[in-house]
Amino acid sequence: MSHTHALASFLADLQYEHIPEAVLARTEDLFLDWIGSALASQGARPIPLFERYAERMGPASGSARILVSGRSTSPYFAALVNGASSHLVEQDDLHNSSVLHPATVVFSAVLAAAQDLNKSGKDLLLASVAGYEAGIRIGEFMGRSHYRIFHTTATVGTLAAAVGVGKLLGFDKEQ
């Protein structure tokens, strides 16, 4: 079995009940920190630009919320604005060896999808842990040399967000 298949199997089989209590508590702390980072961007010039873009390009309302304004929009645009908001003030978490800011990409996507799919807090935590696991492991595999050319949060973070949302959607290891 390849490393990719092993990781996909691990993530697909991951269940809330098997996550250590300390990991769940840390994930809750990271989630609150992420919300604080997003709210800290309130009033910063770029955020209204992202919100106006979401307003013009997206639906008038939707199933997911923008943290800073409380406005509802599509999950796609809520994740976009919340991700930008939470990364703007550079207070979001950093995992050093993967050179990744996982909260920005994982929580933004997972919260928007969880709202859209009417998922529970447990589901949100499980999906977030899966997204963090994927992002950190892939980021560590890519190594620091990847960061010399690419912004790991943008490249590896895309995969981390996809894994988190896939977990909410019930994807199996092949998906």
Regions found by a protein language model. Name each.
Residues M1-Q175:
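N-terminal core-entry segment
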